[in-house]
Structures are given as structure tokens and as C-alpha cells.
Amino acid sequence: MTRTASAPRSVGSARPLKAIYDVPAPAKLNLFLHITGRRADGYHLLQSAFMLIDWCDTLHFELRTDGQISRADLSDPGSPGCGAAEPLPAEDLAVRAARALQAACGTSLGVHIGLEKRIPSQAGMGGGSSDAASCLLALQRLWGVTLPATELRALALSLGADVPFFLSGGHAWVEGIGEKITPIALPAARFVVVKPSAGLSTPAIFSAPELKRDTETATIQGFAANAEGQVFGFGRNDLQPVAQALCPPIGQSLDWLSAQHLQGRMTGSGSAVFALLPHDVDLSDVPGTPGDWKIRKCSNLQAHPLAGW
């Protein structure tokens, strides 16, 4: 069973609002990820197709008039169909996003953030970045403030390379260090996502000498020219060979997908992997994963639940 996005609920008729509940923060999958170069400052240049899926965290925001920013873990390990809850770090990206927006807008208002964390950490699914983006969008409404779009994108990029994507409203072709975002259309599709229990460090992957950093530049036109089902098999993930060497369970999870006659690929810097679920394969045909791996049958979203905010 997949946790789907729900419509946010606002409380309070006067500005600013008193609270906004049930704010979704969807995960992403990288359909491919190419490293095309490296800047003088050490940042890697990439090309990727980012796709939103219906595996979501949920955030709740309650206004504080004392200017303080607080946060609570509302994850319930016993929620049916949702699996084990993800623990929150001491200071997550949602809190950092709230503080950054508060400073940028000069508001004296604060917020209490409740976070139901479901997207796995160290998965390459952008959970923390998505939380930050949803926080930026919701707090502009809660506090009655608005940053110009260019300033909001710059603030988002300062929080993390994936955060601007989650502000873009839908699937996207992403280039540079994450700041060049072009909307793309993708056909509706279902996927199996597998997250082995082990995670790994993103810096360890990018610092590996054997990482391929010179993949030929692709084009959106070349990507879109593929037949409908083939866009989900375009290119490769340049991080995957290094990640598999550092984290053997990634290879094991890919082998498991292959045993189900599914072509798997790692998303982002891992350790989650995914495969397209053909239309003629019933969900009940996909068995559970070994041990404490997490598995979800997900659908891609045609738009971010907060598109237009």
C-alpha cells in the first residue's frame, strides 16, 4: 500500500493563518543521472530527469507568535500500510528552511513543525529536500510573506541541490549543479521501489577516483524521442557502479529485481533502487523483499501536490 498525497488543510480565516495541516512532500526518482564534468570549485555538473512519485512525507505547521521555530516527530511506526517510521535528525532540512525563510523575509513570526517522516533517508529519493521545499511554500502562506521567485530559488539552492526541483511543480530535466530546471512531461507509470536497510555517504561517492565524470551531454529532445516506455530506461546512473562497490546491498537489491524479471536502476546516490512495473504485471505478483528491506509500489505524479503555491 502506498501513502498518497492529501490536500493541505488551513485553519484560521484572518491573515496570518493559524495553522496549515497535511502538507505533502513527495519523493523523487532519478530516471537517469549523468555526470558531465566538474567545476573548479569541486561541484559536479550533472544531467538528470527527476520524476515525482506518490511516496510522501507529511508536514503540519502551527503559527508561533514568539518568533521561535520548533519541530516534533509525528511519525507513527504503527500506521497501517506505511511501514516503519523514519527517525528525524537533530536538525533536519525543514527546520533549516524555516530559519532561512524567516531571515530572508525579516518576519517576527515563528512556527511549530510536525513531521511525519516516511521517505527513507540515505535513499537518493530527496526526502529531506522535499520537506524543505514544502516548508518554504507552506510558510509563505502561514506567515503571509512572499519572496520573489528568483530569491526563493536561490534560497532553495543554498539548502541543497535538489530543493529547487521540488519547487518547480512537476517532473523536470535538471542540469548544472541542480539550478537549471526545465519542465518535462512523462507518461503515467507504476514502479517498484526497493530500499535496502544499508545506506551510504553521498560525499564518499562523489570523491571516489573511479567515478565517471565525463559522460557525453544528452539533450531533452533525445530523451523525449524515445518511445513512451523507453524514457524510463534512458541513459544510466553514473553513480551506481561506485555506490554498489561501497554498499553491496545495492547490488543485491538490483539482483532481486532482476529475479522478478524487472530491470532495476539506482536513484540519485542510493541506496534505493527502482524498476518500471509493466501494465500487465499485477501488484500481487510482486513478492516481499528479503529481511528488513522496504518495498513500495508507487505511481508517478503528474504534478506536485503544491503546484501553484
From Swiss-Prot:
GO terms for molecular function: 4-(cytidine 5'-diphospho)-2-C-methyl-D-erythritol kinase activity; ATP binding. One of its GO terms (biological process) is terpenoid biosynthetic process. Coiled coil: none annotated. The active site is at 28, 162. Keywords: ATP-binding, Isoprene biosynthesis, Kinase, Nucleotide-binding, Transferase. InterPro entries: GHMP_kinase_C_dom (IPR013750), GHMP_kinase_C_sf (IPR036554), GHMP_kinase_N_dom (IPR006204), IspE (IPR004424), Ribosomal_Su5_D2-typ_SF (IPR020568), Ribsml_uS5_D2-typ_fold_subgr (IPR014721). Pathway: Isoprenoid biosynthesis; isopentenyl diphosphate biosynthesis via DXP pathway; isopentenyl diphosphate from 1-deoxy-D-xylulose 5-phosphate: step 3/6. ATP binds at residues 120-130. Catalyzes the phosphorylation of the position 2 hydroxy group of 4-diphosphocytidyl-2C-methyl-D-erythritol. Belongs to the GHMP kinase family. IspE subfamily. This is 4-diphosphocytidyl-2-C-methyl-D-erythritol kinase. It comes from Polaromonas sp. (strain JS666 / ATCC BAA-500).
